[in-house]
């Protein structure tokens, strides 16, 4: 009927010229709950060589969150943060999207994103599957098999009508229906 509000970050102009946008958290990248391969795809979007390999960054994120003092490969716990002059890990899931910048090495790894882009990309909510109808392009890129041509097609299609199921989305793009690969 034309009175629906999109939850994909589309800008609106309200009364008095106020501009606003709404974004569904389930369309964002769930940093606390994503598998390593998906975290790697997020990091790869920076497109530049990182001083710290993705595997080490992911291990550091997991060590930042876990409650033990055991080290994963190329990672660190509280003593490593203290030696680097940083606040120690919380040993809890991240509380805000910007907290990722406190995990050793992630500030440099995500330097291709502004703070606003981090907030527009990452959520700390328990998001398992991505809402493909509200996810920004940066989040859709982490789907296995997604390329720029498929991304453009998906975004153009959902502007006209939403995908009714995840299966319809994957079939439309010619991708395997599993979002939990590889």
Model-derived features: positions:
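Compositionally biased linear targeting/interaction segments
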Residues: 1-182
């Amino acid at each position: 009927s034309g009175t629906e509000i999109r939850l994909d970050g589309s800008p609106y102009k309200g009364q008095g010229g106020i501009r606003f946008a709404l974004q569904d958290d389930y369309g964002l990248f769930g940093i606390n709950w994503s598998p390593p391969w998906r975290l790697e795809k997020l990091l790869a979007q920076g497109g530049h060589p990182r001083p710290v390999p993705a595997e080490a960054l992911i291990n550091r994120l997991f060590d930042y969150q876990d409650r033990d003092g055991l080290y994963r490969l190329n990672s660190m716990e509280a003593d490593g943060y203290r030696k680097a002059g940083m606040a120690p890990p919380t040993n809890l899931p991240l509380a805000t999207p910007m907290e990722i910048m406190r995990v050793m090495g992630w500030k440099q790894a995500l330097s291709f994103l502004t703070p606003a882009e981090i907030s527009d990309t990452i959520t700390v909510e328990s998001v398992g599957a991505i809402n493909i109808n509200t996810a920004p392009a940066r989040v859709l890129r982490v789907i296995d098999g997604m390329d720029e041509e498929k991304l453009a097609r998906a975004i153009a299609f959902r502007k006209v009508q939403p995908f009714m199921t995840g299966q319809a989305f994957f079939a439309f793009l010619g991708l395997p229906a599993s979002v939990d690969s590889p």
